[in-house]
Amino acid sequence: MKFNDYVENLQNYEAGKPVELVVREYGVKEDDVIKLASNENPLGTGKKAVKAIYKMAKHANLYPDDSMFELKGALADKYGVSEKNVIIGAGSDQIIEFLIHAKCNENNGILTAGTTFSMYGIYAKHAKAKHFSTASKFHDLKEIKELYESHKDEISVIFLCVPNNPLGECLDAKDVIKFIKSIDDDTLVVIDAAYNEFASFKDKHKHIEPAEIVKLKNAIYLGTFSKVYGLGGLRVGYGVADEKIISALYKLRPPFNVANLSLAAAVAALQDKKFIEKTIKNNFKEMKKYEKFANATGIKFIKSYTNFITFILDESKKSSEISQKLLEKGLIVRDLKGYGLNAIRITVGLPKQNKRIFDELRKLLG
């Protein structure tokens, strides 16, 4: 069967390997497998969210409330915006897909940093759109602006991943706002803030307020419940923007796109302040251990404002080989070879999990 040419040439997103695969292919006992590849919450899911899931489970035969009234209201209250400024998606990446289809075509496209979340480029290809990226792997706003000015007629969406995945660096909020104000009104600036709860805790200057983004008219703030809220398996994300932007995106949203269990869990997760605080504090307490380990062993690392850390390996050690050897031991990390980096990205886990990573890396890199 023949498919459209652009489909034949599309690349698949490389997700972190599941625990089941490691058990099956390498014979590691399930209890010995540690997954630190996908930036999931190592503490699991909060009690309030779990309770909400159990309560909603008896209604699994029913379609969800398509208005998503409760979750939209909870997010609107949290951020001090109107419910008309909020859209809910099956993960924030679904909203990224909506945005690209709403703004891009064969004659224009997106602009990103050199190394950033790969789904931006993949969705651009879905829309047969162009993809401009900076030479710098990091978010250099000066370079991004220069590239935008030189291709202004061909760029309709600019993605800023704040903090950036997979590197972990983070722009200051004031610089992001200043940048957005310098961009033409018809060019949409997307603030992908999947890890912003972590960045805001580490440095208040990194905190981006969605209500400020709403005022700018040409920008949207994206958040997710997959990281600090511990709901990666339920796929819930959201966008906060001017009402006109949200209204346009709703025309692309399929009905019942987020399950009722997911909606109920997300509402409960927003209220679970103790779980959120515990998650963030564990993350940065353990992050210090990763930094100490890297300094002691001579590994270069990127200062991270997220729940992961990226280790840049020496040329004598290949990231693909190191990640494979870790995998054979039941330790799942993310090889960044596909991003053109000799590096591995490791989700910050629990103390015992992190100790195993350190012990194995010492053997492999020593």
UniProtKB/Swiss-Prot annotation:
Gene Ontology biological-process annotations: L-histidine biosynthetic process
UniProt cofactor(s): pyridoxal 5'-phosphate
Top-rank lineage group of the source organism: Bacteria
Enzyme class: transferase
EC identifiers of the protein: 2.6.1.9
Residues found modified as N6-(pyridoxal phosphate)lysine: 227
Pathway membership: Amino-acid biosynthesis; L-histidine biosynthesis; L-histidine from 5-phospho-alpha-D-ribose 1-diphosphate: step 7/9
Pfam families attached to this UniProt entry: Aminotran_1_2
Keywords of the record: Amino-acid biosynthesis, Aminotransferase, Histidine biosynthesis, Pyridoxal phosphate, Transferase
GO molecular function terms noted in the UniProt entry: histidinol-phosphate transaminase activity; pyridoxal phosphate binding
Catalysis performed (reactions): L-histidinol phosphate + 2-oxoglutarate = 3-(imidazol-4-yl)-2-oxopropyl phosphate + L-glutamate
InterPro entries with a match to the protein in the record: Aminotransferase_I/II_large, HisP_aminotrans, HistidinolP_aminotransfase, PyrdxlP-dep_Trfase, PyrdxlP-dep_Trfase_major, PyrdxlP-dep_Trfase_small
Subunit annotation: Homodimer.
Family assignment from sequence similarity: Belongs to the class-II pyridoxal-phosphate-dependent aminotransferase family. Histidinol-phosphate aminotransferase subfamily.
Protein name in UniProt: Histidinol-phosphate aminotransferase
